[in-house]
Each structure stands twice: as structure tokens, then as C-alpha cells.
From Swiss-Prot:
One of its GO terms (molecular function) is ATPase-coupled intramembrane lipid transporter activity. InterPro entries: ATPase_P-typ_cyto_dom_N (IPR023299), ATPase_P-typ_P_site (IPR018303), ATPase_P-typ_TM_dom_sf (IPR023298), ATPase_P-typ_transduc_dom_A_sf (IPR008250), HAD-like_sf (IPR036412), HAD_sf (IPR023214), P-type_ATPase_IV (IPR006539), P-type_ATPase_N (IPR032631). It catalyses: ATP + H2O + phospholipidSide 1 = ADP + phosphate + phospholipidSide 2; a 1,2-diacyl-sn-glycero-3-phosphocholine(out) + ATP + H2O = a 1,2-diacyl-sn-glycero-3-phosphocholine(in) + ADP + phosphate + H(+); a 1,2-diacyl-sn-glycero-3-phosphoethanolamine(out) + ATP + H2O = a 1,2-diacyl-sn-glycero-3-phosphoethanolamine(in) + ADP + phosphate + H(+). The chain crosses the membrane at residues 165-185, 452-472, 496-516, 1158-1178, 1319-1339, 1366-1386, 1396-1416, 1433-1453, 1474-1494. SUPFAM superfamilies: Calcium ATPase, transduction domain A (SSF81653), Calcium ATPase, transmembrane domain M (SSF81665), HAD-like (SSF56784), Metal cation-transporting ATPase, ATP-binding domain N (SSF81660). This is Probable phospholipid-transporting ATPase DNF3. It comes from the Eukaryota. Residues 1-164, 473-495, 1179-1318, 1387-1395, 1454-1473 are lumenal. Pfam families: Cation_ATPase, E1-E2_ATPase, Hydrolase, PhoLip_ATPase_C, PhoLip_ATPase_N. The keyword Flavoprotein does not apply.
Amino acid sequence: MGIADGQRRRSSSLRTQMFNKHLYDKYRGRTDDEIELEDINESKTFSGSDNNDKDDRDETSGNYAAEEDYEMEEYGSPDVSYSIITKILDTILDRRRTFHSKDGRHIPIILDHNAIEYKQAATKRDGHLIDERFNKPYCDNRITSSRYTFYSFLPRQLYAQFSKLANTYFFIVAVLQMIPGWSTTGTYTTIIPLCVFMGISMTREAWDDFRRHRLDKEENNKPVGVLVKDGNNDAQEVYTLPSSVVSSTAYLTKSAAAENNPPLNDDRNSSQGHFLDTHFNNFELLKNKYNVHIHQKKWEKLRVGDFVLLTQDDWVPADLLLLTCDGENSECFVETMALDGETNLKSKQPHPELNKLTKAASGLANINAQVTVEDPNIDLYNFEGNLELKNHRNDTIMKYPLGPDNVIYRGSILRNTQNVVGMVIFSGEETKIRMNALKNPRTKAPKLQRKINMIIVFMVFVVATISLFSYLGHVLHKKKYIDQNKAWYLFQADAGVAPTIMSFIIMYNTVIPLSLYVTMEIIKVVQSKMMEWDIDMYHAETNTPCESRTATILEELGQVSYIFSDKTGTLTDNKMIFRKFSLCGSSWLHNVDLGNSEDNFEDNRDNTNSLRLPPKAHNGSSIDVVSIGDQNVLDRLGFSDAPIEKGHRPSLDNFPKSRNSIEYKGNSSAIYTGRPSMRSLFGKDNSHLSKQASVISPSETFSENIKSSFDLIQFIQRYPTALFSQKAKFFFLSLALCHSCLPKKTHNESIGEDSIEYQSSSPDELALVTAARDLGYIVLNRNAQILTIKTFPDGFDGEAKLENYEILNYIDFNSQRKRMSVLVRMPNQPNQVLLICKGADNVIMERLHDRELAAKKMADICTSTKERKDAEAELVLQQRKSLERMVDEEAMARTSLRNSLSSVPRASLSLQAVRKSLSMKNSRTRDPEKQIDSIDQFLETVKKSDQEIGSVVNKSRKSLHKQQIEKYGPRISIDGTHFPNNNVPIDTRKEGLQHDYDTEILEHIGSDELILNEEYVIERTLQAIDEFSTEGLRTLVYAYKWIDIGQYENWNKRYHQAKTSLTDRKIKVDEAGAEIEDGLNLLGVTAIEDKLQDGVSEAIEKIRRAGIKMWMLTGDKRETAINIGYSCMLIKDYSTVVILTTTDENIISKMNAVSQEVDSGNIAHCVVVIDGATMAMFEGNPTYMSVFVELCTKTDSVICCRASPSQKALMVSNIRNTDPNLVTLAIGDGANDIAMIQSADIGVGIAGKEGLQASRVSDYSIGQFRFLLKLLFVHGRYNYIRTSKFMLCTFYKEITFYFTQLIYQRYTMFSGSSLYEPWSLSMFNTLFTSLPVLCIGMFEKDLKPMTLLTVPELYSYGRLSQGFNWLIFMEWVILATTNSLIITFLNVVMWGMSSLSDNTMYPLGLINFTAIVALINVKSQFVEMHNRNWLAFTSVVLSCGGWLVWCCALPILNNTDQIYDVAYGFYNHFGKDITFWCTSLVLALLPITLDIVYKTFKVMIWPSDSDIFAELEQKSDIRKKLELGAYSEMRQGWTWDKDPSTFTRYTDKVLSRPRTNSRASAKTHNSSIYSMSNGNVDHSSKKNFFGNSSKKSSERYEVLPSGKLIKRPSLKTQSSKDSIGGNITTKLTKKLKLPSRNVEDEDVNQIIQARLKDLE
């Protein structure tokens, strides 16, 4: 017990609240039995229905606080140890402490607030229940995701501002400056600007937080219905129920429907006449008889003890104790996807004793009970409490335990239940989801700020050094020239030591610019707006643009090393799709949803049948989304009445148009409208599984001939009596029978008369039932044990047939059994019962009647799979070693083969090799074609591609197929050369064949002998399972068994006894189920796709290429997480997956062994999978945690499943703390991701369909995961480069300018005199050098976005801090110092020592000033800035021209005749001297020339990655490839609606033809390119988009996807360079990691044509 007690953190609460203790004890092998409330709860029948993943949830935990939480645990009243000073500090700093009561919180369950018991527990003033810990009312239900309060903003912001070292430095200087007699520049010239600049920064931060407050207000003001028993009601407060509840206040459950036996589960049949008038949902009865009204309250107004009424699809506003509900068996379902990431619905039940009281209206109105619950805590998976009811018979109090099945938490959604009444037990910040959020999120600061602070420290040291140096010079000159009355006219006056030193410090202190941070704030505001205005990151479906809520850390978007992503709703689309199935040894693709997916949103929005560009073309077709109703499109694809070639499908002209659709309602239900049709089954090309399927598996290259359900249904309709057709129909029937879905017929006229809503707690079953409907087996109704199915025996166009099946028993699925069974009495088999079982492949295979054969085949498949994966891994390792040798053979030999996977950021090996290869080429020639050739040579030798991995897969599977041909004979379908032999005679069947297309189907199916060959079917089925699993699909194996009626009845008695047993019920039920689930016959396999969002796989692959490690942290179960890992390519086919569990005997040895293997380079790709229970164990052991973190930093990826929100935050914090220079990014969409988002350096929220919880607290929000690519690779890189260049240019100009002051002191005996005129000196940073640094900080783009997206390896520039570091800073300091020396000394020599007109301070300073202003402007805008445009020229003209105007205006400001002759010197003296102008010109040009020569020499000798690709992207052929590679990311911006005249003016400019101003001419010209009315592109080759120009123009130019016109290479030039550059296109395609297929001209032309259409 000592060990267990040591694990407890809240030992005196109602329960320990330490579920880590249970896990730790379980891990340590504790066997002593303790009786706890949870054990009692599990022994009762009322504890809730069996949940598939309950055991997994009980093992998962996360009882810890992330490091940012400031949490203090006290028991009893806080007044004892909670001092007044601590309270004040907590209020000011907005710190939150957690206190605990001695025996839990006691809450009366009373609807009548006038009852004596309620008044005793409530305050007299407002009637709110009292929190015993504070003797104050419980907190309200307001939540706050903002970072500051009214009281905490000022102290926290002052801390944040003075953490910027420059502000601290200037504050000290300002204090010294205000000391009388010390300052020579005024008293308040530093403190006032400092306060203004800090005020601007604080105002911007206040505005950002104000927006968060505004979003909080939106959620806090949501309405909810509250039951109130009060005679005085305000009519305006009465809550209006949803129409669905008003129309059917008494929703009939399955049991009620069985009693009334209606023909359908129809809402209209659930009328007032069928329900119990005393039921709680008779709201009229509650109102009229019991004076219970439904009031509308805002969420924030809810208090503990309120009775909340929820209706279907409502969000749960607070943590509620269930009182009653109208679901079947008093059961309700909640979706907790936003809470813990689980996709399956959870079953919840009110306590049976409590439900007895509140089920009736009278009981609900008059209930008087009490509940004692635990104090607020972070444990999402456990709950403990006591229900106290009074026994009126003997006046005793009965206590009943409450468990997690009796409560529903905030962040959940009520599903499949009409009405629920619950009482608030935790509100606001004390709810579970808010307790898991960080209570005191830290103020985020960029990593670059730390470097800036160090540089400022260095500059302070420099200022102090040169100030002391100047003072030393002053002392020496004073002794030499002033002391001993040598300068008698000064009367030996001395200012003193301190004033003299301070004068130098004040003169030099602006080397550190005072406006540094405020200028950076202005730049970052513009940067954030440019991100928000990016149309490529706009999600049209949800109308969600990119939103920047924090401008402070913009540059960190370009430095990310780790990405932590949620799964549900972030990577996935929250949809389960029935994608593939295997039947009798042949695999089939179910692609019914591909033509009607949400990807058509843009097309449906305009209601036009338009073509959209695909991510990958197939078989020469570039159709990605096609409306099947467009016959023109079908004609172009060949689906018309024209003769059908081999391999093509028949025409759809005779098929009725599809009108079926599916409307998903979360993961709980789907409304299916319309009847099945052949047109609905018709899909696009076979290989298009979904957006992400194109990169799911390399096996597609071999499996591209897979047939679809369209082909299968057509075959069944043509040959209904064939053996395969009979088995297929039986398989479809099994899909429709073996499930627990509830069909509900709806009669919403707007939906359609044939619409049926399927409700299920499992999204997988929802996908199976909808697939059965697609295939012609419609689950129509369920009444008691009768399941009605509508079939179409004569085809979808024929008359439907209703069949009734009696469901005798359900054997439910759970996490131990991993299978589900249903026993059915078939209509035509009265003496037999059909058992249909579905489950995991290993579970079903070991229960087949020939299990030995299945086991042998499974072993063979496993061996083959292992050999294939080993071959793939070996290929990857060889490629990596070759890559390392090419970079640096000697250096890499001394380092680990896996050093690129360590936590220390490293450069891309591919780019290093490219640079080395190009440098070797450059030593001989600068031929660009040889540059490309060198890149291609490098990639061909060492770079892995999907085709090479695919070739390994194909070779392995072809070898297996060859063995099958040798074993089963040449008439097997995979041979493809022999006609299969079915029951129908060959000659007869050949006469019935109309097309060769039928032959392909028959060859795919195989002969009857093969279909009946059990060994063959099992082998092919296991092979299909392997292929499906590799693609990341969730597989289920179906099996069946016929049972004699007598055998069934005997078993049913035993099964009934097990279900009614009072002891060990669960074990006995499982044993009885296992008894009947034996000796099964294999039926088929289904593969369900957890649909990823568009572009997720491609995005993750590019993220990996960028050198960013991606982790997936999810609350879902392990199997689901691993499947998604395969789907999104987080786990490769050849990956070594290391699973860490609490059952591992020596887990630390296991982790060390894996770490050593990774270090040795023997693992090609390593992924660690860990669950929440194991993480909880690691938390209690620092040694385990340190070893685990070290292992994770070496692996390629980590998947953490069953993770609580706090555990997600802990994982992020642990990695963030390993290296302070690493930048972490967390992305999620739900409330369970808030803590993770706040813990990371950068938090990105997905503002999607499931609410704005994560988006509200995030730093940046986007609509889809794929937008992360442009956010990081383009805007992140630009922001990092702009900020770095701004910092460098700022320090450069300050050092260049103020070092001239130091040099000039030698000519003034170090007197502290300034070289420059005071007004000019004060305006230097404001008027003459602010624009160039602002422009480079706002608009710098070193490379084009298409280059950055196509070559993600370039992202390492920011990740490795190559844009701003000490080396680069010192390089700029040396350049600035050199220029200062050149300018000042040459000025003295050329003007000061030779001028006869005026060689005083004023002209010397004027020449210096002119040269420095010109140098800074030209260097910033033309030397350092890559995208030179009109803004660069404008800023230079304004700055330099403004300085000249200023010089002319200075005499007006200084109109008095003084020795310092400003008033007349320029016009009357040196301004007329040609030497002055020549000196100014030479000093302005010479430093600029030296800078240009230095930069050119550097680019030629040591080119950076940016230099290489900046040159390559200027070439037309390379730009074309780059645009094609980035088309999917930039398509929206390129194809967005634009002004047609823009393209007209552009083409006029390129073609050098006269511009026309006639609108009619422009309209005619545009109409000749494309048609705006119907949105269709004219593909006619006769169309000339160059208007009235000659055909030579169209032959000379082509249009890129971006709309840019480029010249076509001439045929003569192309042929002459065929030997050298003929393969440049192919080579560059490999380099840029474009799709693996060859980019054919017709594909490019289709992109161009679509681009021309979208330019309208």
C-alpha cells in the first residue's frame, strides 16, 4: 500500500482521483483485493451498457498538470493557509488554485428551489448553491480562453515587454538621462518614445486578446433550456423547443414501437395517442399541472444544481448528472469526439433508482434527493459519487454509487436521443474539459527574441567599450592639448568623469535602435494580414479563411521542427467510408461516394458541371470531379453509344439518373435519400479511391485493374444464377443483417419520401449499412426482433421486394472478443438458424472450421509480408547510405547513419548533395542544363522514390501470384489468359457475351472450381487483408454458419442463463458466445476507410521532406490510430512499429534496445506507438520518461493513442524542453486539443465543422490541415526571412551610421561633438532609413511560392536558423564597420583636406549623411531584396529624394548666422563646389559597389540553396515544372475569379500588340477563350486564345497554370540540344518530387485550358 499511496495526489478527496494508481498497481502486479466504489458500480446492472472500449478507457489516464499550470491543492477552507497577499497576487496575475473539500461536494437534487432542503444549501440573496470550500456560490458556467483579465494584463504585459532586453536597456538609459546634468540630449527624449513604443506593442496585444474575449462571449451566450419550477415566469424567458421535439415530444423507442407494432419506425406514428401522459417529456403536463416551465438561459448563467433539458444534436453546456432520458432502456448516446477524440458514440444511462423517480412528470417536478460527487479534477475516464435517496417506508437514507456512465461532460454532443434531463454538477472552469486546459497559459515569445536579446547584450557591451575608449581618448587629448593652460581660452573647465562618460554613452546608445520592437510590430501586423488575405488558405466549404490571432511569433512558422497533430477532425474528415471488399478470392472497389463527395463543393456552389484539375491524372484523363448528370462529359470519356473498346465500361444512357445522397450527422447517424441505381454505383477511374488514396500504397501499380461495385452489380444482374452471384448476394445480405443500427423513416418533404436515417453508436456499422443499401439491400425497418429489408431481385429499376428476417440473438462486440454475431431465422429456412459473425481477421480465422489451414496460410502471408518489408527497408537504407556518401564520404563515416533523425536540427542531405554537385559543375562550367543534369544524376543514384518501393511490392506479389498459378492451374483469374469455367457451359456463356468487357469481369472472378476451393479463397482473402491493411483501411472478416434448430434452442437456454446470471455475467456471456461462434465458414472481408481530409497524405509527405517530425496524439484507440498512420503515410509499409504497453516486462530495456538499433542505422523507418496508460506510468518514473523522450527524438514519428488532453500537453512540453532552440507546433480542432495548443510554441486550430474550441485559443486558425503547407513553407519562410533581414538591416544601418561618430572623434579630441546636424541626426531613423527596412521586412520574397511548395527541403533554411545567427550577424557588423571606415576616412581625405570653400563639420557631416543614406537604401532594396518591384524603387526615391529636399530645407530651420554655418553654407559656399558633389557621388557608389562585388563573389563560390533555386526558377521550362508541382496547393489562387480584362492587358503586353480600351472588344476576345455561361472549357484545338493574333503567337507561347505566358522552345533548338537537355523535363520532375507519372502534353494542355476558363 505504501507504493500505491505514494502515487496519490488527492488522498483526502471523495475518491483518490488517482487513476494512475490503479495503472501503477496493475503494472507492479498488485493482487490484493480492495472494494472501491468503482467495483461496486461495476457489479450493478445499472452501471450502463457494455461499451466496446470500456476497459481501454479504464486503463487510460492523465492525472497530471502541465508545467504551465499553477496548481495548489488544499483541503477544507482555504482561509487557513491562503494569505491575503497570495490572494492579491493570484488576482493580479490571474493564477488559479485548486482546493478540495473533505468529503466531496453535496448537491441537492431538487427542482423546486423553494423547498426547505434547497434553501438550506443555497445563499439567501440569489438562491445559488453554496460551495463548501469557499462558503460562496459555485462558479458560474462562463469559460475564458483569453490570456489576460482586466487586472492581470498590465503586470503580465510589463513583464513581457521588459523581457525584451532592448526595452530594459533603454529604460536604464532613460533613468540615467533624467539625472540633472548628465544628459546632453535632453531629459525626456528617451523615456517618452520608449513609453509610446511599449504602449503600441501592448495595445496590439490587448487587441488580440480582446478578439479572444469576443469569441468566448459567443460561446458563453449560447442558449439552453432549463427546467424551472416557479409560479412567476416571464413570458420572454420561456424556451422554445426545436420543431423536431415539438412535433414528436413522445419519441417511440424500439420497445415502444414493438408494443404498438407500427409498420415503420415513423415519426408520424409516434403520436400523442401512443405515449404515456405522465412521461417527463410531456411538457404541457409539466407546465399546466406542476408549474414547471422551460426557461431559456445563456450558457454562462448556468449554475450547479440547475436542471438542463437537452434535445438531439445539442452540445452539452456543462458537466451533467443524468436524471432521465427517453431513449431505449433509458439509454442515451453522446459523441465525445471534441472531448477525448474517440469516434464511437458512448452509451450513458441515468441511475436506475434516480430514473424511476424522474421518468414521470410528477417525479421530476417533486424530486427531493441529494448527490455527493468528487471535487473537480482532470480525469476524463473515471467518476465517483453517491446518490442518497430517502426510503419513505422506514425513513432511512439509501446510498447508491454513481459512475462515469451516469454523467455527461461539457464538449459532448447528444446523439440518437430526443430528450435528456440532467443536473449541473460542475460548471465553467471546473468542468472536466476546462480542468484539462492550461489554467495559466504562458505568454509566448519567439525563439528569435532570445537571439536578439543576446545581440543586444553584445551591443551594450560594445557601447560601453567604445564609450570607455572615447573617454580614454578624451583624457589623453586633454592632457596633451588642454591641461597646463595650453588651451587658455577654456579656463581649464572640466565637465567631470560621470558626465563625460554619460555623454559618450548617450551619443552611442542609439546603435541599439529605440524603435526596434515597435517597427517590428508594424512589420508583423502587415505579415499577418498578408497571411489572412491568402486565397490559397481559404476553405470555401466552411467559409473559413486563415486567421492570425498572434503576431508575436510569426517568424517561428518558418522554424518548426516538430508538429503534434490531433487525429479526429484534424487529419480525418470524421467520415467512415465503405471502400473495398473481398469476396470469394476477388477484391472489389466500392466507389459510390466518389462522385458525390464534398470535394464537389466548389462545383455545386456555382451549380455548373465543370471540370476540375486532378492531383494525378490516370490513363490520360484529367477528370477529377465529374457530375454524372453531364452527358457531354460522359461522351468525352467514351461512355456513350459508341462502340465499346476492351477495358471500357458500358454506356449509362439507359440508366436512370442517380438521386441518392447521404447526409452525415457526426459519427452517429446518416440520412440516406433516394433509391440505389447503377448510376450511383458508377464511379470514376478505378484507381481513385479518394484524395489520399493516390499515395496510400505502392501496391496500386499492380492492383490498378481492380473492379468496382458497378461491375459486380452488373454481373449479378446479367448472371443472377451463377455461383459467384449467389455468394455475392448472400454477402450483401450479411452486411444488411449483422449490425446494430436503428433505421428511422423520416418524412421531411425537403429531403424526400425515400429518406431513411440510420442511427448507430459505431461509425463503422453506419458505413456497412449504407454500403449494403448502395448494393441493393436496404435496411428499411426494425420492429422488435423483425428486421425488414428491401431488395431488388429484378434490378434497381425493377419492383422492390420486402423481406422480413427474425433476429433471434445479438452477441455484442467488446474489446476482448473483437467480434460480433447475430443469429437470424431466414424466411425460407424454418429448420435452421443462420449465424453471421464479423470481427478481426485473426479472431475469425482461428474460429473457421478449417482453422489449421487458415493458420498455415496466415503464417505464409506473414512470412511473405516480412520478406517484402525487409526488402523495402534494405532499399531505403542503401539509398540513405549512398546519399550520405555523396554529401561527404569522410565526414559522414564519422557520424551516425541516423543523425538526421536526432533532436538536433540538421540540413537536408539532398540539398547538401545538390550544392556539392553543382559546385563541382560550376568549377568547370555554368551551363544550366548541366546543373539540372547533376541534380538528376544525384537523385537517380541515391534518392528513394515511390516507384522503387512499389517495384519491390509488385515483385513480391507477382512472385506469390506465380506460385498460385503453378499450384491452382492456368485457369485462374489472375493469369488473365484463359477463360474461367463456371457452371454455365462455355459455349452458352460466350454466346451471351456482348463485349470483351464481360470477359474481363469473368476473368477477375475466377472459375467455380476456384470459388469452391477453400484453400484458394482463404489464401486470396488473407492476401487482400494484407493489401487493405497496408492502405490503412479498417478490415472486418465476415463468416457464417448454419445451425440446426434443436442445437440452437439448447444453446439459447444456456445463453439466456448466462445473461441473467448474478455472478460473473460478462465472463459467462462471452463463454456462451464463443461456444456457438465456432466452425465458421469464410464469407468475405470488408475494408472501411476513415476518410482523410483532402491532401493530408501529400502534406505529411512534404512535411517529412522538409525535415519536420510529425507526431499524432489522439484519444482514439490504438488500432484506429495505427490505421490512420498507414493511411496518411505517417507509417510506411517498411516501418518498424514499436508498441510500448504497460504489460512489457522490462520496458526500459526495450526502449534502450530500440534506441541502439536506430543509432546503428539498421532501421529504415521507426515509429513508436504508446498509449495513455503507459504514459501515465512514465510520469511517475522520471527515468522512464527521460529514456522515452530520448527514444522519441531519434525515431521518425510517434503515435500516442488514448491520450487525455493533459497528456497531449505533457508530450509537447517534454519535447519543447529538450532543446530551447526547437520550435514545436500543435494543431487540432477540438476542445481536447486546447491544452496541447497552448503548450506548444505555435498553436494552430482547425476551424471546422465541430466548433471553434481549438480555433478560439490558437495562435493561428485554418480551415484544413493541407493549408499548413503554405502556412509554414511559404508564409513561415517569408516571415522568418523578412524578420531576419529587417533585424540585420536595422543593426547594419545603426552600426554604419554611429560608428562614423566614433571615427570622427579623433578629429575633435574625443570631445563628444557630433558630426551631424542635430535635426538631421534626429530624423535619420524616422525619415530617411525607415522605408527600406520596412519594405524588406514586409515584402521580401527570396523564392517563389511554387518553388517552396514543390521543393520542401528548402524549409531547412529557417529550421536551421540560417537566416539569423551569430555568424551572419558578425558578417554584417564587419561590413558595416568597413563601410563606416571607408566613408569617413575618404570623406576627410577627399573633402576635408582638399576643400577650399568650406571644410567645417557641416559639409563633412552632410557628405557622410548622403553616402550612408544612399548606401542603406540601395543595399536594402536592391542588393538584399530579391523581389525587386515598384515598391523598392519608390522607397529609394522617397528616402534619397527626401534627404535632398531636407538638405535644401535645412537653411530655413537654421536661419541664424552661427559659427556652425547651416543657414548659408549649402547655398553660398560648398553647395557651389563641384568637389562636394563628386565626393558625395564617390562615397555613395564605392561602398555599394564593394557590397555588390562581395555578394556576387559569395554567390558564385558558396551559393546557398536559395541562390541555386532562385536562378533555376527563372527558366521557363523549370518554372513550368514548379507550377505543376505546386498546383494542388496554389490552384485556388490561380483559378479564383478575376477581372477578364487583366488577362487581356497581360497578353497584349507579352505579345507587344496595341492595347484596346473597348469593352466590347475585350468581351469578344474573352468569349473566344472560354464560355462564362456554362463553365465548360472548349477543348477544340481550333480555338486560339491569343485573340486576333496570328497562329504564330500561339505556337510561340504557352500559358502556365498561374496564367503566365512563356515562350515555347523552338523545334530547331530543341533538336540540337536533344543529346544534352532532352531529358531535362524528366530529370527535373524527379528532383522536384512531382507525381511519379510522366507529365504528358495533353495533361498540361488540360491544365492550361482549365486555367483559361478560371481566369474569367
